Amino acid sequence: MAPVGRRFRAELVAAYLVACAVCLAGQSNAAEDPLFVSKKITPQGEYTSGIEGPAVDAAGNLYVVNFQQSGNIGKLAAGASQSQLFTSLSAGSIGNGIRFDRQGRMYVADFKKHNVWVIERGETTPHLYFHSDRFNQPNDLAIAADGTLYASDPRFASPVGGQIWRITRGADGKGQGEVMSSTRRLGVTNGIDLSPDGATLYVSESNSRQVWAYRLDGSKLLDPRLVRGFADFEVDGLRTDVDGRIYLARLSAGKIAIIGADGSLQREVPLSGKQPTNLTFGGPDGRTVFVTQKEGRFIETFRVDRPGREPCLQMPRMC
């Protein structure tokens, strides 16, 4: 048996260590942002009113189109509070959707010149990946595990006539695209993303304020299913998480709606700005949502409980 004094000192040390552990845990929890509470992270006016296409690379950097002027792509480094110029598209081109594949290539939809550009990992120079005169105006992009791109292609001047494109990588490294067939006449196709298993494509339609689901079969959109519609406010960009929930930007409502795959409205996240155009998942654990705001032309962010589908695609170890 240890002497009483020595035992008492040992008990004091043990109690101190436990208290420190509790204190540090409390500080860690306090430092963690509350879930589903949005805050602005960049200055107002950094981007044009065409702010769109947020996408995060494997290093955690955020990229957004139309930084300072149309045609530029801005980069918000991980943890930074101000964007910087990353690159510019060729004269006359204006970007919209951005996505990254597993190899770190960046793809940019160019609605003005009917292109999809690619920027190789570690580079800043855009190269033409795919062009078609049949494009209305390529808008947003979704990417599958094998690198297949799906592009929404709305005709904003008409409530019908929207398209969805499927673009694959050919042996020469160039994109090969085709308009997907559908048993349903499409409206103003806008936001687009895949289910976690890659079997279902979700598409928002601005004019009808609806989100539709399609079963994928090559270049066919099958079994159209209305996931959810809204009585007011346009719908814009959308992304899915690993549980198959849909995060949907509700333009002019100032909210991100979180919708179950069954169409249930699970939550609405109030935002700092009233005109969210699009969103993406990022952060070291894939649980940070970044939102582009047309009103004020800034980026805001909030934490969520589950990672996004795409971060888990790029870095499977996090999921």
Explain the meaning of each model-derived region.
Residues 64-84:
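Beta-propeller domains
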Residues 1-8:
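N-terminal secretory signal peptides that target proteins for export/translocation
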